[in-house]
Amino acid sequence: MTATETGTAVRRARIERRTRESDIVIDLDLDGTGQVDVDTGVPFFDHMLTALGSHASFDLTVRTKGDVEIEAHHTVEDTAIALGQALGQALGDKKGIRRFGDAFIPMDETLAHAAVDVSGRPYCVHTGEPDHLQHTTIAGNSVPYHTVINRHVFESLAMNARIALHVRVLYGRDPHHITEAQYKAVARALRQAVEPDPRVSGVPSTKGVL
């Protein structure tokens, strides 16, 4: 988070993360309008991150070059880590935010729920996915996305943003719908949690710090 000349907080972050497995640049603006531009080399993951940024009303640009010739795992995991880092950085001292958010998202036969506490204490609980998502691949005609990584995405996001994140699937059948409903539920919960609260000027904690 940076500040303008007038002292108004600008809740933006840029993260550059490079390893032998991936090269990532993320630009995030929490006070955006849902303008999203994502290219990770994994088309279904692009689709999920586009949904997340759009439904959170974040302006989000993601550029990832990963070793997808091996598999998508490193690319997806590392991008989720960097996105969590960007979220944590953009939140700054967390003054004036609502802190908590939750959302139920239906997608046809599926219903998912997410709850967020921007607590500074990283934790993730992920429950309810049907067993068949442990071995489902969503591929189209390009680099496949293995739905077994869904939990890892949410864990990586939560740990690196330093938030408590609970995600659950109440019911569902189609792997695409189940996965997308979860991403959208997380997006809507984050949108609520990071929104400015007009009734709060300081840090929303009795401890005075998050």
Swiss-Prot record:
Reaction(s) the record says it catalyses: D-erythro-1-(imidazol-4-yl)glycerol 3-phosphate = 3-(imidazol-4-yl)-2-oxopropyl phosphate + H2O
PANTHER family noted in UniProt: IMIDAZOLEGLYCEROL-PHOSPHATE DEHYDRATASE, IMIDAZOLEGLYCEROL-PHOSPHATE DEHYDRATASE HIS7
Similarity comment: family membership: Belongs to the imidazoleglycerol-phosphate dehydratase family.
Phylogenetic classification of the source organism: Bacteria, Bacillati, Actinomycetota, Actinomycetes, Mycobacteriales
EC class name: lyase
GO terms under biological process: L-histidine biosynthetic process
Name the UniProt record assigns to this protein: Imidazoleglycerol-phosphate dehydratase
Organism of derivation: Mycobacterium marinum (strain ATCC BAA-535 / M)
Keywords, ordered alphabetically: Amino-acid biosynthesis, Cytoplasm, Histidine biosynthesis, Lyase
Pathway: Amino-acid biosynthesis; L-histidine biosynthesis; L-histidine from 5-phospho-alpha-D-ribose 1-diphosphate: step 6/9
UniProt subcellular location: Cytoplasm
Molecular function, one GO term: imidazoleglycerol-phosphate dehydratase activity
Listed SUPFAM superfamilies: Ribosomal protein S5 domain 2-like
Enzyme Commission number(s): 4.2.1.19
GO cellular component: cytoplasm
PROSITE patterns for this protein: IGP_DEHYDRATASE_1 (PS00954), IGP_DEHYDRATASE_2 (PS00955)
InterPro entries the record matches: IGPD_sf (IPR038494), ImidazoleglycerolP_deHydtase (IPR000807), ImidazoleglycerP_deHydtase_CS (IPR020565), Ribosomal_Su5_D2-typ_SF (IPR020568)
